[in-house]
Each structure stands twice: as structure tokens, then as C-alpha cells.
Amino acid sequence: MEYISKDIEKKWQNFWSENQSFEPSSSKTKEKKYILSMFPYPSGRIHMGHVRNYCIGDAFARHFRKSDFNVLHPIGWDSFGMPAENAAIKHKLHPKKWTYENIDYMRDELKSLGLSFSKNREFATSDELYTKWEQEFIIKMYEAGIIYRKSATVNWCPHDQTVLANEQLEEGCCWRCGTEVVQKEMPGYYIGITKYAQELLDDLEKLKEDWPSQVLTMQENWIGRSEGLEFKFDLSKESRAKLERAFTKYFVFTTRPDTIYGVSYSALAPEHPIVKYIVEKNLLPEKKIKAIKAMQKIPERDRATQEKEGIDLEIEVMHPLTGKTIPVWVANFVLSSYGGGAVMAVPAHDQRDFEFAKKYNLPIKQVIVGPDGIIENQTEAYTAEGRLIESENFTGVTNIEAKKAIIYHFEQNSFGIKKVNYKLRDWGVSRQRYWGAPIPFIHCEKCGLVPEKIENLPVALPEDVEITGEGNPLDTHPTWKHCTCPKCGEKATRETDTLDTFVQSSWYFLRYATDNKKWNEVGISKEDSDYWMDVDQYIGGIEHAILHLLYARFFTKVLRDLGYTNSSEPFKKLLTQGMVLKDGAKMSKSKGNVVDPDLIIDKYGADTARLFILFAAPPTKELEWNDSAVEGAFRFIKKFFERAENVNQNGLDNFKSIDHSALSKEEKEARKKVYEALLKSNEVFTKTYTFNTLIASCMEALNALQTQKNDSIWAEGYYILTNILEPIIPHACWELSKKLFDLKNFDGKIELKEEVFALESIILAVTVNGKKRCEIEVAPDTSKDEILVKAKIASAKWLENSEILKEIVVPNKLVNFVIKG
């Protein structure tokens, strides 16, 4: 048979499309598999990263579909976002037109790969129907107290003119455009993810078997749970007066209450209210005020990597236990978003505090000593365990015991409380841009902030806008933002901020799980969600570990609590695929090392691209592009296709009734290679994900078949191999299966045959006093006595004239004779 990839691939892609071959059954009687690759942003062209992601997902979907599962394998488009606005400015196109033209082009590109998506469930997150249901969720979250509006210091991208969440910063720069981010005070909407911090942390335990440990660790660290003591520092009388009595105290949180007697200074974040007040009122010399202002302009993330710097605020607080005064500084290492933006500093037992104290010549008081009890002139902080010294009634107690005892003492005397803190911050979702989902709230002078009525949703974007790159066009639109208050009917204005695009990707998997026939009536069908959720296999890059993956977990829990789903975790299994490299670097236009998938498909065919992508490296590892390996993949498919000529009618008539016992040793070996590939297939798709080893096993099986002349073995071999390879090279396999088996080998799982794996003989090592001397070959059912007789004959020259003290037979492994002398 001649292999002409273009003709074969076009034929089967049209067949699959016309017959809706990959739509899931609406019946819920079968066991299901929900396979999902992270949906793409419609940037205009697919790249090799897309190809790898979607070929992996498609392999899973096809495997489980032919294994008689009801498979949901959808595709859609994460279509809101700043790149559309930037493209609108550059190409003078409306963002909507640019976006949907890209979707049309990329849809055709993905089709050319032969991906088995459910077409009926395709949507874009910029579709008004998707926006409608998302806005309903936002209103319900607002009513439940999960969404709120406040003014805060935010990360501002001067280039994109929008706010960024902490998770969207990369080394202090915008994750999208790379512009250095600045700090800015402005009002915005926040989603209370911190309300779910403990559940998000606890439920990582449920994922530890099937998620990469690196992702779990990243999320655990990002949530950042810590237990400790929260207490107040009272300002000294003189400091209260200096601050014009605007402040009398502030609160700090510490995970080391055992070191509280070693506090030698306190430090505040540059954004702390006291620091802001001092700057606003010019309560310090001009030089210090300028230095503080400069510190305030630097994002927290950047400050964390800078050299530790501080400024004496010339105020003092009282130690809560000793009553002694302690100087207060502003320091660049204190985070306003953690523990109230204030810390107690114990230089003797914290390396950061130690370095700061050394730099500014602040006192260092040791209050914990090691087992030797020696107090030394410290060159670094003592952070090991030990016993307390110079700590009043707690002196002599181990620091572990002291933590509990000091917290108890504070609580009993109402000085402070035991508290759990998290590094995780509430999620700021306001974005000052046009191409996003409008936030469905209205500002009324009389009623304040009012959600839009559910029956008025969606709040859709106006299309008559001009994108200039200067501010948000919704702010200046002549009519769109002007409306009436849903509560009192008076004149009001719409919120012009739009939602962070990570909101859309935080629930799209639940939308897919809803039968598309119900999309007009509900955003999420609970009945359908109960059947399809959780996603059985999710595929995407590890770069989403603390952005999309955390937000998706959070949103699922919120929607559960709001009654939309019973699911608590969205993704059972997670596979994070590695990057595709060329010349040792990530493909990029600037490096000139981009490989265009369209050109590869045009030259070799989609099956070759798929085979190379899945064979070149395990999916979780980086993949180095190799032109000669692509050629090799093409040659294998061509050989596999052409060798099918060896399958004749005689073999097709008889392969299902092969008598294994009547086969020659070579025939049995060839048949075993085929079934080993089938066994490997089941293992790869459920446990190891190592598609490369499966493909190698199929190549070995084909080589083994080539040595045979048994018609039935050839027919059975192709019956099984076309089934195994269908998830990887589907077009070629459907073509062969149709010609040879009328596609019947894709109906249900092919069962393993035990007789194929039955051992014909066993090789046993024969050892004398533990030293291997020879080997014997015996049948699997040979008795122990027969084995010993055969072993003695084989090792006679080493046993000659020796007294055998012991005879040991280890089944299926060895025979050992222990002899005297």
C-alpha cells in the first residue's frame, strides 16, 4: 500500500467532522473519561508548544475512547486579554474582529493535526453567553461576601495601563509585556481567596498521588501557612505626641514568640499607615522623607531581592513584657501584605534581622543558647533549638516549650492571641482595559455600589470604540457607562473596569462539562457536572502552577458552595509537559529558531508531527527539535503502512482462532512482542505517560513480525498494532483499519491473552557456595527433584569429590549447592 499522507489525512479529517465521531454520548450509563488540555489564547498561529500539548491530550482521549469509555475531550478559546488590544492599535483592527479571525485560523490548524475534539462544546470566553453566566457568578459571589471593593496599593503596568495580581509579576515586570511594574494606590475589586486558604492547603493532600510534587510544593509555599502570635506594640508617650495622637499602637505577627525577649527593634513596611502618615505630615527630615518615598515606589517583589535597607522613624514602642522602649524603623524587607506590615526584629535569632542590625549598629541580644549553654560573640544568627536565657520566668525552658507557654501567657493576660497567617493575598481582579468581561456593578450616588439585575445580563461590551492605548475606552464612551440604578431607578454609571482574564479560565472546564444544548438555560449543569467532573486528565505547562491552577481550584470550591457543582477539586490527574526547544533554547522569533507546525504538516503529514512529538522525549521532559528524527518518524509510518501488504485474506479469516501451542518458538516470540506492546499501552496511558517507550515497543513488534510468514500472526499483529498506535498516528491507523478490519478493532478494548506470556522454559543459574558456575534450562512445571538432578549433572565438575551439605532451589531464579571445604 502506498502511503500518501495528504490524501489520507484529509479523507479522515473530513470523515470525523461529517460523522461527529468524537462527540460524547449524552447517555450517562458508561464509565467516563474527561480529558482536557489547557485551552489556547487565540494569538493567530499555533506553535510547537501547542502541538505537543494537544497531541498529548488527544492521545489520551483516543486511547480511552477505543477502550469503551464515554470520552469528553473539548476545545475552546481563552479569548479576552490585552494582546487583542495591542494588536488593535498596531493593525487598526477591532479586538473582537482580530480575536475571532484568529480563532477561525487556529481552528483549521488544530483540525489539520487530526485532534479528536468535541466540536459541539467549543466556545470562546469572549462570547456574550459565556460572559452572561460569569457575571451571574460574580454577583452571587458579591452577595455571599466573597467579592468586595476597596482602595489599595496595586501593581500597575505603565505600558498596558492595567493592574496586575502578584502572581502576574515576573521579576518585578509585567508577565505579558515585560514592562517594569510600579506601585499605585487605586480602588478595585478583590476576590476573597484567603477565605479558602486552609481548604486549598488541606486538599493538596488529595492530589499528591496524581499531581507533580513540584506543583504541590509551589502551591503550598504560595499559600504560605504559618502559626504564631499576634500582639500589639504600644507607642511610647513621646511617640504618640510626635504622631499627633493619630496612632497609639500597631499589631505584629511572629512565628517565633520564644525569642520575644530578644527584640531590639521593630520594623514597618513602607506602605504601613504610620509610615504613610509620617511622610504625608513631613514628620522627619527631608532626606529621610525622600528615601522613604523612593522605597515606596519599588514593588514588594523587587524589594525582597534587594539589599536590606531601612530608615529610623525616630519613634519608639514599648516591649509588651519588659516595658522597655524599642526603636521603630521602616525596612524594605517587611511586606505590607503579610502580618499587618509590621515585625518584631530579633537579630540574635534571625539572619535577616541580624544583617540589618549589623548594618545599622542596632543591639543584638541572645536569648536562646545551645546544649553547651555558651553565649558567644555572634558572627551570625543562632537559629537552632535550645534553652531560653534572660527571659524572666521562661528562662531555662526549651524554645519549643516556650513558644506554647508564651502564647498562653499573652492570651491569659489579653496581650495577644494565637493566630494562623497566610502569605496568600486576596485576588485583585480589576483591569483597566476594554477587551475583558465587564464587571457587572453600578455606581449610584444614592445607593452606593449595586449589582446589575440578573435578568439584565449580560452586560456586554460596546463595539463602537476606538482603541488608542491611552486609558480605558469604556471610561470615555459617550453612552455605554451611563445607566439607571437597578435599586432606585436614579441616574448612575456602570463600572468600567473589566475582569482579569484568569477569572474566565477558572471555570471553563465546568462549562465544557455542561451539555451544549443547555447552554442558554444554565451556566453550569449540576447534573452534567456530577457525571463529568472531575477532569480525569489535565495537561498544561508548569508555569501555571500558582496562577491558573490555584485559581481554578479556588473557583471550583466557591461554585460548589454557591450550589453550582458538587465538585471540590477540578483536576484528578495533572501532567505538566516540558517545553519544545531548538538549538538548546525555547523557540522564539527573536532567536530565529521557530519551527512552523504548518510546514511540517505540509511536508510530512500530521501523523509524522504527532509521532515525533510523542516519541522524541517523555512528555514531562523538555523536547529538543531534531530534523533527522522527524524524517525517521516519517519513515516508520511509511514502513508500517507498506508492510500491511503482508496481511492477506487467509490471515484475516483465521487470526482470531490462533492455537498458540502449535506455533514455533519464533512465531511465539513475535506474537509475544505484539502483546507486550498492548500491555505497555495500558500501562502508559494509566500510569507512566511515557509514550516514547510505547512507540519503541510497537517498533520492536513490527520488526518481529517482519521475520514471520504466518498469515494469522501478521493479521493479528496489525489488528493490535493499529489499535495501539491509533492515539498517536490516527490517520494512518484508521486507513489501515478500514481496509483490513472495517474499523472493528477500534470497538472496545482488546484483551490480553495469558497463553502468550506463558513461559516456555526458565533459565536457572547454578551456583556452588554462592559462586555462579553454569545455567540450566527447565520447563516451568519441572519438579524440585528434577531440577536438582539436572543441576548436578550440569555442575558435576565443580561438585566432584565434594560433600554436598545443602541443596537450595530458589524458584525461577537459581540452584545453589553448599559443599564442604
Curated annotation (Swiss-Prot):
Gene3D superfamilies: 3.10.20.590, HUPs, Isoleucyl-tRNA Synthetase, Domain 1. One of its GO terms (cellular component) is cytosol. GO terms for biological process: leucyl-tRNA aminoacylation. Keywords: Aminoacyl-tRNA synthetase, ATP-binding, Cytoplasm, Ligase, Nucleotide-binding, Protein biosynthesis. A motif ('KMSKS' region) lies at residues 586-590. Its EC number is 6.1.1.4. InterPro entries: aa-tRNA-synth_I_CS, Leu-tRNA-ligase, Leu_tRNA-synth_edit, Methionyl/Leucyl_tRNA_Synth, Rossmann-like_a/b/a_fold, tRNAsynth_Ia_anticodon-bd, Val/Leu/Ile-tRNA-synth_edit. This is Leucine--tRNA ligase. It comes from Aliarcobacter butzleri (strain RM4018). The lineage of its organism: Bacteria, Pseudomonadati, Campylobacterota, Epsilonproteobacteria, Campylobacterales. The gene is leuS.
